[in-house]
Amino acid sequence: MDVLAEEFGNLTPEQLAAPIPTVEEKWRLLPAFLKVKGLVKQHIDSFNYFINVEIKKIMKANEKVTSDADPMWYLKYLNIYVGLPDVEESFNVTRPVSPHECRLRDMTYSAPITVDIEYTRGSQRIIRNALPIGRMPIMLRSSNCVLTGKTPAEFAKLNECPLDPGGYFIVKGVEKVILIQEQLSKNRIIVEADRKGAVGASVTSSTHEKKSRTNMAVKQGRFYLRHNTLSEDIPIVIIFKAMGVESDQEIVQMIGTEEHVMAAFGPSLEECQKAQIFTQMQALKYIGNKVRRQRMWGGGPKKTKIEEARELLASTILTHVPVKEFNFRAKCIYTAVMVRRVILAQGDNKVDDRDYYGNKRLELAGQLLSLLFEDLFKKFNSEMKKIADQVIPKQRAAQFDVVKHMRQDQITNGMVNAISTGNWSLKRFKMDRQGVTQVLSRLSYISALGMMTRISSQFEKTRKVSGPRSLQPSQWGMLCPSDTPEGEACGLVKNLALMTHITTDMEDGPIVKLASNLGVEDVNLLCGEELSYPNVFLVFLNGNILGVIRDHKKLVNTFRLMRRAGYINEFVSISTNLTDRCVYISSDGGRLCRPYIIVKKQKPAVTNKHMEELAQGYRNFEDFLHESLVEYLDVNEENDCNIALYEHTINKDTTHLEIEPFTLLGVCAGLIPYPHHNQSPRNTYQCAMGKQAMGTIGYNQRNRIDTLMYLLAYPQKPMVKTKTIELIEFEKLPAGQNATVAVMSYSGYDIEDALVLNKASLDRGFGRCLVYKNAKCTLKRYTNQTFDKVMGPMLDAATRKPIWRHEILDADGICSPGEKVENKQVLVNKSMPTVTQIPLEGSNVPQQPQYKDVPITYKGATDSYIEKVMISSNAEDAFLIKMLLRQTRRPEIGDKFSSRHGQKGVCGLIVPQEDMPFCDSGICPDIIMNPHGFPSRMTVGKLIELLAGKAGVLDGRFHYGTAFGGSKVKDVCEDLVRHGYNYLGKDYVTSGITGEPLEAYIYFGPVYYQKLKHMVLDKMHARARGPRAVLTRQPTEGRSRDGGLRLGEMERDCLIGYGASMLLLERLMISSDAFEVDVCGQCGLLGYSGWCHYCKSSCHVSSLRIPYACKLLFQELQSMNIIPRLKLSKYNE
């Protein structure tokens, strides 16, 4: 009851007396949903499905390996399993391994894949169980992971953070995420117009065996089928005849009996007449002549052209429509529907929208890995077949034992390479994708979470097309409208909203049964004419025609009832399309859906009673689904529904109610307080900056050794929270600090969004951060029995103390923790042998191996401290030494800060506290912000955040700034007045310099500020003299190499425009790469040391200064037989 009292404690009597009975607590469905589904659950579900179901299907599809050499020999897979992650300690000794150990030791977190097989050896049949064939990288928190089902205490034992989302892989010690990939949906007819306005239809078919794309094109009013196995387009009527529909009347019946449809199809019939094709055989022969010859490796019996054409029609064109024993009925009707759609679209231009989100499917880690594994498994089997074909004929003495020839590393390396490089190239499917995986960004907790919900669409970033980039209305509630990067990837990289779920594939057997029980007439029993009756609807299941139905409304309503009662899977969707007169049932994976509350008789089905039961733990989210209180809708089904946002907007047509409006936004946008008061681009900027804010990354951050880790010294919870912040537990791992802000102008150092910071706050640790870097080194063994070793420090001859470079080394030659390390000092004094290969026979072998020093040195402008040193070994049995280096940095001028409203600014001035203005309660602001940042940016949310934060501090409680809700400004201001502050949040402020009161009241209060990772120390760069490149003798480039600043083409043009020719000469030659050359005045070629090799004389040689790069160019041109000649003339002639 206390919880309820707190919840209702802040309501006024008027609100309590309001007549509408609202389910106030319905947002509690959210934590229940996230408990079941979670933000990363889609990755994990899909991987679990792959490991437990899909992998067995792949094995079933390729279960037998036979050999042409010996018909008696075979190998058959009986079962396949993926084990638990382990590591091989020594030969054949394995032990379970934790993810953290894999991170530290640079190993892959993977589990063995084992199979049960049955095979023949000689004349006996052998069954072997649990035979390993490779290793599978395991996704963290999946069903095969060590972490699954553990309590927080056990997490701590395993050095894992309980808040870490999981859903990524650890490959060679690096955390890798497989991004969600966005595709056009498979097996669906898409009608579109090309650039010239000609309408065509296309289907991308995909089954386990084949993927292919079939197009329907219109040329001069005639219809053609286009496919890349055919050398030219084939008239559609010939295709129908080849499929066994020989009578023209029947063809017309299938396509449509309406006037305009028959008129449009006429020319195609005439064309077939001209080609003199009437029977199925003639048509097949015609197609057989047009088939592209495929060069097959296997000999195999040659097929006739007619057989080849039949095979092609049955298995390659429209692959996903099944053809049993050459019964082409279903495929005919499918083709007819394609033609019909094109004809109908020509008249009133009803083409499909490629960017409509119901036509999209999202591929998750499980689907991508199953494609990859299938490819590798097929390769593995074909290798075995090759070996069998080679070995069986040879050795008749010994029996051929296939187990000895199984190569385990093939599947392992294939998986590891694909995940670590991100290149998915499968030759079978002509699939070649780059950048499928990315390194999990560990800048902050939010950046890791945001990466798990990211969607990457395979679209060229360089093309400036607005279609795929714009925000589609069909993305409402499924994708976050704010969270997309700026620049070239804008709108192509998207993020999931908070409650989105991505479906996985499910069995469609029960659906087919249910549909036929509800009166769907089977497609094989149709004559075709039914398709054009006005009241007959076609029924599609996952893109295949199931049949037709007369009363489609009854079908749809009964289907939904059955789904709500739990007889069918809750993620199956059914939707009607009135323009095409179709009912679509989908049960395939990769559809986006989200839960809604069902509305019955203008009242939501969920009542306060249900919510109390949920709060007390009697019910979980599943119960809401089974009792038909809540259901999932996908994008297509949302079009049939009428969804109310709030309960007071429910009318008689409403079918569903939104659970909470703020779930429209994703994870990153959910952190913003009052985002509905901000201008839209500001929220987008904050989504990008929230991922760069430093804070905490997990409870195990002190045990990790990452390449680069930024931590805030004193992170704080934000004073103004949102519901999202609580749901994703951001307040346990925050990134930022509550700063007291005065909005006023102070000195001239705060123009252009610069901030003025209080020096005393910095001294007390405001914005102070720790930067951790790592250095690592491996000690290898070499083939000739030599190995790397670590030498002790070198001692000075006179003082017997280590020399300066080795000052921090212990006696074992590795730096000791806690020492301060300066630039160019040695961290590990490693030396490696000069000869690492086995020397050739007969050459004189040096007895004692010679060693050369290859020390690991510290490179960095500022000093660091050694936090810890870890000594271990990696998977290749090499010694592995990792050092963690720490720097503590306080904010300085030029460091970047930002509030949660996309208002970024650099620190412009640090002022001692005695010069800062203060209010009459003696509070000095931490930050002074220029008021000019507000008017043009229109971030009213920031103003409200300051008010709510101030009221919260005075009351000692957190306020909510949730999107489309949150604490009301009126209530917050009344709280301020109650504590004796101004209603408007303004204070009377005294100047710190003159001691007189300022002439205006100052808006003053706490705002949550984030420190971003861009610090001046890492970016500052200048150079006077320094290293030069060897080849061109010009200064190197880049800050890390201490490079110069380039004067480029545009700067050169500018100087030419000013006519400053001597400055040009000085910048481009004298300060860069001036060089003295000798030139022969007679032939114009370069001479060397005063002698022209071409003229064989030194009479005309004179010396000039030209850039070295220019000399290099001349010589490179000469080597290609192009001769540049320098013409010299005396300047006074």
From Swiss-Prot:
Necessary cofactors: Mg(2+)
Protein's cellular compartments: Nucleus; Cytoplasm, Cytosol
List of residues binding DNA nontemplate strand: R195, D432
Known catalytic reactions: RNA(n) + a ribonucleoside 5'-triphosphate = RNA(n+1) + diphosphate
InterPro entries: DNA-dir_RNA_pol_su2, DNA-dir_RNAP_su2_dom, DNA-dir_RNAP_su2_hyb_sf, RNA_pol_bsu_CS, RNA_pol_bsu_protrusion, RNA_pol_Rpb2_2, RNA_pol_Rpb2_3, RNA_pol_Rpb2_4
Disease: Leukodystrophy, hypomyelinating, 8, with or without oligodontia and/or hypogonadotropic hypogonadism: An autosomal recessive neurodegenerative disorder characterized by early childhood onset of cerebellar ataxia and mild intellectual disabilities associated with diffuse hypomyelination apparent on brain MRI. Variable features include oligodontia and/or hypogonadotropic hypogonadism.
Pfam families, alphabetized: RNA_pol_Rpb2_1, RNA_pol_Rpb2_2, RNA_pol_Rpb2_3, RNA_pol_Rpb2_4, RNA_pol_Rpb2_5, RNA_pol_Rpb2_6, RNA_pol_Rpb2_7
Zinc finger map (C4-type): 1080-1095
UniProt lineage: Eukaryota, Metazoa, Chordata, Craniata, Vertebrata
Gene Ontology BP terms: defense response to virus; innate immune response; positive regulation of innate immune response; positive regulation of interferon-beta production; snRNA transcription by RNA polymerase III
Record: residues binding RNA: K186, R213, Q438, Q692, K896, K904, K1019
The name this protein goes by in its record: DNA-directed RNA polymerase III subunit RPC2
Main function: Catalytic core component of RNA polymerase III (Pol III), a DNA-dependent RNA polymerase which synthesizes small non-coding RNAs using the four ribonucleoside triphosphates as substrates. Synthesizes 5S rRNA, snRNAs, tRNAs and miRNAs from at least 500 distinct genomic loci. Pol III-mediated transcription cycle proceeds through transcription initiation, transcription elongation and transcription termination stages. During transcription initiation, Pol III is recruited to DNA promoters type I, II or III with the help of general transcription factors and other specific initiation factors.
Binding positions for Zn(2+) per the UniProt entry: C1080, C1083, C1092, C1095
Outcome recorded upon mutating A365V: In CMT1I; affects RNA polymerase III assembly; no effect on nuclear localization
